[in-house]
């Protein structure tokens, strides 16, 4: 009720305007909707304040009109009329009233008033026939819906006779007749091959709009057949988009609906040539949307649709530029959307015939050449997009010079051969509101921009522009809201001293700007919402004037050379900041030692600076909103303060590579929403916390500290990544509480002892396992073949990417909404160090591009332990493994031939063990193998050759004196070489036990022969026998003398 009174008061203000202003309303807004009305009211009231010549008067007509508007609002609300209801006809009526016609109101519009008031006395509910039909429709719909979703099928539709079906969801009725005029059925979980029985819609004789985006396969009517839709003689709008299962067999049904003015078949997976001939009877069609399918030419048959004004063929696979000849014959077109197809070649000259065309979108094709000269005939053109094409050579704007109505122009090229032809004379007659010329190898700003006065969005990014930033664009265009100049070669940024502008989005990142940020930037741009000046060469202090940017929500100045302390005015004045990125600079001093005004801060990144001292209490200003905090790579000292656990909204915390001491506060790891915590590279001591908080998988980095004691079993309950490398942890490998979530486990360089737990075999989602440089002993469990070491349903990224559409709408039409999209990303890069190919490298994940190297790394490192026994042949089933390192242990027996199944292996290190036998010839099938090291073992036989083995040098085989052949300098016996080549190395596996048997036999024979010889010698009387007996007697006498 309060809303209705406000509308009434607004209307009274509306009619207190001049006749000329009222005439403008009549011409441009014959039907005013609510939000447009409020905008107009504000606009007109502003203009009245600027004009003192207009006297505010209130006519009787205005009062009557306002009352009618109020009554219509009240009744529309009571009758459940959506989208305007009675507002539209009454607004159309009262918008014709002004002060001059007010006196003639009762005479000229009396009949309309009588008819209107006659209809206001009551609202009609839905008729019984249609209520029953709706219940039948619901029953049928439930029969084709999956059982799991039955409770969601039109829950407000019930069989209560007191229930007004006009109030049901998805329904709109005519307020006077009570007849259904709109039926909307959204996405549903339907059974396969579900067909809609159109005869169920026949009772709705006055329906005007059918929206069936539900997942149907088609239509059926066993009585009327293809002619079924002709029963709906008032049907004007048919929306069948997003069904995804339709094909061309529905077109005969649609062709019968000859009253249609709007048809949408968007996103239905329709393939092949579209049979336009099958909808040739839709002669009243004004809008046709076939976007997001897999359609291709020819387009013959489109010419039958002579009244068509809007055609959307975007996101298909049309390719031949000659197919547009058919489109050129459609001279009544207002909008033509052909973006994201595969059109190749130059634009045809015939497009110039479409002199009524207002919107033309040709973006994301493979067009080349230049604009046709005939484009100068497109006198109605308002919107032209040529983004993401393959334009080359000189590109001229001359064909657009006389297009006085042009408001939006967009151009970019996938080729680096494009050169923009610039003009020196101001001959262009258009006044643009949006200009986008990006990725065009532009070296000079087009001169026509100097004469534009109404620009609201300018995007000149990804070019080769140099010199001064074009701040003159601000002076010339007071309504400019968005200025994007990133990825250029600008070197100087100077702000005019006197300017104060309304600019809200400024991006000049990735340039070559050096020197100081302008001192007056905060005064000149006080209304900025977002500013990105990252990846430049700025130096010096932050200007204190930035504290005047009270509305700024995002500031990114990372990757520069700023220095000094953060200005006090900055940390107290920018109270709207949500995202602050100052990474990779030289800021110094204590970090936020006092309270700040950052009460809304969600993301704070100050990593890789020179901040010193303890972690400042200023962080507590945003204790409930702060989600991302990165203070890594600074010079922070002291303990980790216990109050940091009050930052209850933290999801990412990184304070690695500082000089923090003391123990880890258990309450810090108990924060409920943490997804990543990195405390590595400090001087932390004490034991590990017993558990971590959070409901999701946590990535925990504690490596390179001085932590001691055992690893608690409960610590592993919720982790996805656990990095404990290079501490002083002891005890055995913990019992894993939850083995499903862990996919990176790194425990290198500790003092772990005992055998390898068989629970390691339950790490089914593991990608990287590093237990090297410990004191583990015993056998390698053969059950390790259970490990996946391959792509699973896990990913290494941490963070969010938020897409936000700003409130600006620079242009809007049937198919096009030109607004400004802001993407805010809060990704945290993950660094994992792992030994591969004889190097200890870093592998990164969690970048914004989702092609992280870390996502493709699968490895196992058990080196530098005390493991013994045989290498389990079952390890050969780890086919996705890229790295295996078993070096520096006490492993014996032979190399399993099953290792030939390691198809993706790149690095295999078995060096410094006690392996015997030969190298299996089958290993030459490992086509990805780059590093192979079996040095310092007891291997023998011929070194295999072929494929990757031809690339390995002698270092791979050092310390194996019984190996022969290339690349060693030891030759092999010719016969042995022949035998081994014939046997393919398979018999070599049996050589080890045969050689050992011969060794044992020869040793025993020698021992027995020696004993027999001594015995025989004693049986003969000879000087040797007597000498031996004397020695024995002397020895006995000596022993007796020693006894008491």
From Swiss-Prot:
Protein name according to UniProt: Receptor-like protein 8
Stretches in topological domain Extracellular: 23-996
Family indicated by similarity: Belongs to the RLP family.
Annotated spans, Disordered: 969-990
Top-level taxon: Eukaryota
Organism of provenance: Arabidopsis thaliana
Side Cytoplasmic, residues: 1018-1044
Bias (Acidic residues): 980-990
Its membrane topology: Single-pass type I membrane protein
Keyword list, A-Z: Cell membrane, Glycoprotein, Leucine-rich repeat, Membrane, Receptor, Repeat, Signal, Transmembrane, Transmembrane helix
GO CC term, one of those recorded: plasma membrane
Sites carrying sugar chains: 159, 197, 267, 390, 402, 532, 551, 561, 586, 623, 646, 751, 786, 885, 925, 938, 969
PANTHER family (UniProt xref): RECEPTOR-LIKE PROTEIN 14 (PTHR48062), RECEPTOR-LIKE PROTEIN 8-RELATED (PTHR48062:SF52)
Parts of the chain that traverse the membrane: 997-1017
Sequence ranges of the LRR repeats: 204-231, 232-255, 257-281, 282-305, 306-329, 331-354, 355-377, 379-402, 404-427, 429-452, 453-476, 478-500, 501-525, 527-549, 550-573, 575-600, 602-622, 623-647, 648-671, 673-695, 697-716, 717-740, 742-763, 764-787, 854-877, 878-901, 902-926, 928-951
Subcellular localization: Cell membrane
Signal peptide residue numbers: 1-22
């Amino acid at each position: 009720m309060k809303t209705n009174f406000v509308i009434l008061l607004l209307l009274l203000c509306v009619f207190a305007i001049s006749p000329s202003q009222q005439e403008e309303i009549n011409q441009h807004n014959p039907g005013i909707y609510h939000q447009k009305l409020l905008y107009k009211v504000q606009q007109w009231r502003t203009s009245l304040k600027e004009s003192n010549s207009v006297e505010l008067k209130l006519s009787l007509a205005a009062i009557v009109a306002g009352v009618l508007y109020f009554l219509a609002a009240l009744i529309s609300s009571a009758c459940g009329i959506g989208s305007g209801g009675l507002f539209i006809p009454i607004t159309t009526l009262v918008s014709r009233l002004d002060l001059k016609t007010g006196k003639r109101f009762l005479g000229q519009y009396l009949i309309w008033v009588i008819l209107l008031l006659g209809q206001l006395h009551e609202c009609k509910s839905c008729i019984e026939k249609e209520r029953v039909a709706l219940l039948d429709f619901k029953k049928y719909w439930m029969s084709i819906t999956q059982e799991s979703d039955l409770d969601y099928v039109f829950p407000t539709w019930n069989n209560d006779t007191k229930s007004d079906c006009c109030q049901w969801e998805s329904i709109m009725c005519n307020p006077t007749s009570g007849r259904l005029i709109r039926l909307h059925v959204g996405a549903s979980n339907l059974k396969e091959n579900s067909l809609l029985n159109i005869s169920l819609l026949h009772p709705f004789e006055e329906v005007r709009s059918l929206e069936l985006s539900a997942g149907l396969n088609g239509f059926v009517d066993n009585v009327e057949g293809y002619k079924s839709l002709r029963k709906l003689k008032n049907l004007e709008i048919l929306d069948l988009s997003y069904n995804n299962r339709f094909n061309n067999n529905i077109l005969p049904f649609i062709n019968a609906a000859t009253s249609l003015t709007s048809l949408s078949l968007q996103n239905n997976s329709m393939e092949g040539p579209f049979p336009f001939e099958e909808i040739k009877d839709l002669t009243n069609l004004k809008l046709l949307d076939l976007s997001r399918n897999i359609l291709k030419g020819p387009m013959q048959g489109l010419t039958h649709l002579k009244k068509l004004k809007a055609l959307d063929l975007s996101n298909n696979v049309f390719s031949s530029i000659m197919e547009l000849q058919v489109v050129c014959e459609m001279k009544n077109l207002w909008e033509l959307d052909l973006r994201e197809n595969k059109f190749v070649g130059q634009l045809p000259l015939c497009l110039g015939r479409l002199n009524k065309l207002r919107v033309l979108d040709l973006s994301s094709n493979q067009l080349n050449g230049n604009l046709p000269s005939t484009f100068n005939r497109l006198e109605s053109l308002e919107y032209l997009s040529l983004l993401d094409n393959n334009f080359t050579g000189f590109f001229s704007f001359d064909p657009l010079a006389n297009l006085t109505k042009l408001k939006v122009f967009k151009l970019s090229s996938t080729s680096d051969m494009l050169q923009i032809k610039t003009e020196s004379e101001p001959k262009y007659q258009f006044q643009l509101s949006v200009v986008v010329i990006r990725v065009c190898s532009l070296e000079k700003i087009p001169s026509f921009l100097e004469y534009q006065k109404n620009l609201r969005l300018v995007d000149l990014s990804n070019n080769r522009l140099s010199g001064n930033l074009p701040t003159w664009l601000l002076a010339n265009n007071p309504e400019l809201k968005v200025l994007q100049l990133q990825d250029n070669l600008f070197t100087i940024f100077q702000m005019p001293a006197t300017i104060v502008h309304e600019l809200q989005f400024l991006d000049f990142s990735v340039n070559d700007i050096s020197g100081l940020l302008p001192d007056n930037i905060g005064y000149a741009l006080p209304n900025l919402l977002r500013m990105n000046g990252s990846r430049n060469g700025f130096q010096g202090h932050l200007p204190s004037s930035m504290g005047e940017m009270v509305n700024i929500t995002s500031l990114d100045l990372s990757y520069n050379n700023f220095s000094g302390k953060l200005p006090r005015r900055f940390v107290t004045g920018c109270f709207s900041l949500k995202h602050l990125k100052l990474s990779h600079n030289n800021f110094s001093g204590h970090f936020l030692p006092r309270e700040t005004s950052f009460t809304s801060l969600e993301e704070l990144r100050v990593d890789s600076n020179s901040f010193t001292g303890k972690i400042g209490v200023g962080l507590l200003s945003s204790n409930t909103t702060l989600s991302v905090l990165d203070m890594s790579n600074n010079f922070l000292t002291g303990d980790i303060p216990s109050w940091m656990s009050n930052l209850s909204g933290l999801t990412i915390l990184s304070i690695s590579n500082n000089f923090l001491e003391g123990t880890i506060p258990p309450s810090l790891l108990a924060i409920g929403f943490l997804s990543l915590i990195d405390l590595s590279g400090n001087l932390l001591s004490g034991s590990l916390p017993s558990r971590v908080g959070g409901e999701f998988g946590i990535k925990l980095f504690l490596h390179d500290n001085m932590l001691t004691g055992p690893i608690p079993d409960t610590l592993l309950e919720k982790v996805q990544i656990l990095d404990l490398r290079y501490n002083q942890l002891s005890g055995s490998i913990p019992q894993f509480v939850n083995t499903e979530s862990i996919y990176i486990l790194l425990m290198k360089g500790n003092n772990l002892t005992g055998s390898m737990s068989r629970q390691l075999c339950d790490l089914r989602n593991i990608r990287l396992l590093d237990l090297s440089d410990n004191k583990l002993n015993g056998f390698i469990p053969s059950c390790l073949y259970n490990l996946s070491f391959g792509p699973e349903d896990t990913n290494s990224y941490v963070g969010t990417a938020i897409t936000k559409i700003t409130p600006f709408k620079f242009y809007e039409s049937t198919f096009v909404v030109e607004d400004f999209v802001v993407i805010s990303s809060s990704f945290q890069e993950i660094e994992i160090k792992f030994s591969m190919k004889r190097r200890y490298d870093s592998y990164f994940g969690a970048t914004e591009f989702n092609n992280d190297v870390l996502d493709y790394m699968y490895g196992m490192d058990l080196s530098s332990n005390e493991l013994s026994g045989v290498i389990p042949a079952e390890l050969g089933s780890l086919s996705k493994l890229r790295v295996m390192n078993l070096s520096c242990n006490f492993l014996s027996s032979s190399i399993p031939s099953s290792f030939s199944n390691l198809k993706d292996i790149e690095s295999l290190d078995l060096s410094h063990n006690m392996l015997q036998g030969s190298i299996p010839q089958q290993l030459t099938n490992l086509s990805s193998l780059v590093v192979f090291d079996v040095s310092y073992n007891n291997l023998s036989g011929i070194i295999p050759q072929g494929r990757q083995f031809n690339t390995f040098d002698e270092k791979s085989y050092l310390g194996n004196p019984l190996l022969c052949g290339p690349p060693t300098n030891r030759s092999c016996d010719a016969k042995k070489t022949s035998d081994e080549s014939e046997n393919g190395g398979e018999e070599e596996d049996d050589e080890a036990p045969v050689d050992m048997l011969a060794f044992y036999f020869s040793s025993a024979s020698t021992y027995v022969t020696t004993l027999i010889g001594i015995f025989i010698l004693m049986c003969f009387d000879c000087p040797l026998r007597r000498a031996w007996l004397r020695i024995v007697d002397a020895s006995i006498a000596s022993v007796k003398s020693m006894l008491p």
